[in-house]
């Protein structure tokens, strides 16, 4: 059995929700984003744990993700954030999931399916305030869809939302987006709707002016991406493996393809069974660390498809039975998605989501030190 395993700690998820709850007002609801298999944390198990922890609602990207939750017997409120085909819109109505809407055709399909099924369709009006992806953009378009909504009596505007594009780097632009959004909320309410307003994802959820009726954290749930809560959130992922070889090499010996590492001294090299075929970026070659016996060991040589190599010369006593941490905590040390993302010239999201199917996942109820 391959010993490269992604452990997901359920108690960390619940604990992170508790920390977030303590830092937002009591009257602000919490919608957790569990798209993309809960950012690589198992969508069904994570959603169940978060629901038990008191989360108000969940968001996914596509109707297929909502269907997975419904098929697992999870009947909590679910919002589908992304665009959708006619068939996907009809499926959203059938499984009682709320759907983001931003044009007249989407409204018409929801209305038709709701009428056919004898139920109410639930929708969240998406406002494009500067992202230029999907959403109602501009006052005229907003007036048009609000007017058209009068012809769709079986579609309830359950929510209204937007998405900030630079909340972590540009507060001034985010405030401009928020002003556009607030005007849209006023218009929707003046038209007779009473939607839940939400805009703040992880980057903005700690800023009171952006919280509205509900916040919508994603990556923060999983233990990262909230500078204001640094040290209080716990990584819910831990990627571990064990050595497949430990060997001594001489000064002048090279390690790996391209001879990119040549030993300057007699060294001890540990080979680990993980590589870019598992989603571990080749850009981490000769840069990243792993943790063994609570200490950092530097990668040497190129990341291969199936293996990486690390220098453990200064860490005595390492054996083939030692657990090696690729992402996560060991002792007082921690390798975070942010750390690896900076080295790989990417974002923490890609690190979290990048590990592939041949990395086994183990759901753990409680972290054991």
Stretches found by the model and what they are:
Residues 4-8, 12-15, 22, 26-196, ...:
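Active-site-proximal beta-alpha core segment in soluble small-molecule metabolic enzymes
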């Amino acid at each position: 059995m391959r010993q490269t395993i992604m452990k997901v700690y359920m108690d960390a998820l619940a604990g992170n929700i508790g920390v977030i709850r303590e830092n937002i007002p009591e009257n602000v609801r919490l919608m957790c984003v569990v798209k993309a298999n809960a950012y690589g944390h198992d969508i069904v198990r994570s959603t169940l744990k978060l629901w038990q922890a008191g989360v108000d609602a969940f968001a996914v990207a596509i109707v297929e993700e909502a269907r997975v939750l419904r098929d697992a017997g999870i009947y909590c409120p679910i919002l589908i954030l992304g665009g959708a085909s006619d068939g996907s819109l009809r499926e959203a109505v059938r499984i009682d999931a709320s759907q983001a809407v931003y044009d007249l055709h989407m409204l018409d399909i929801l209305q038709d399916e709701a009428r056919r099924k004898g139920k109410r369709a639930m929708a969240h009006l998406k406002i494009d305030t500067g992202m230029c992806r999907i959403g109602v953009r501009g006052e005229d378009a907003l007036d048009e869809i609000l007017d058209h909504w009068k012809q769709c009596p079986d579609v309830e505007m359950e929510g209204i939302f937007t998405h900030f594009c630079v909340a972590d780097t540009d507060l001034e632009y985010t405030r401009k987006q928020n002003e556009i959004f607030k005007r849209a909320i006023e218009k929707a309410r003046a038209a007779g709707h009473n939607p839940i307003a939400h805009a703040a994802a992880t980057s903005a959820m700690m800023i009171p002016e952006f919280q509205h009726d509900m916040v919508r954290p994603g990556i923060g749930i999983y233990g990262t991406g909230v500078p204001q809560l640094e040290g209080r959130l716990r990584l819910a992922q831990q990627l571990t493996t064990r050595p497949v070889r430990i060997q001594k090499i001489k000064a002048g010996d090279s390690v790996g393809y391209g001879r990119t590492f040549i030993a300057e001294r007699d060294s001890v090299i540990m080979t680990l069974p993980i590589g870019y075929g598992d989603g571990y970026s080749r850009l981490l070659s000769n840069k990243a660390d792993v943790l063994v016996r609570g200490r950092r060991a530097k990668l040497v040589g190129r990341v291969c498809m199936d293996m990486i190599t690390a220098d453990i010369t200064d860490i005595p006593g390492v054996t083939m039975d030692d657990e090696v941490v690729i992402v996560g905590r060991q002792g007082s040390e921690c390798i975070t998605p942010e750390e690896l993302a900076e080295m790989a010239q990417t974002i923490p999201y890609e690190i979290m989501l990048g590990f592939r199917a041949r990395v086994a996942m183990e759901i753990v109820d409680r972290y054991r030190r």
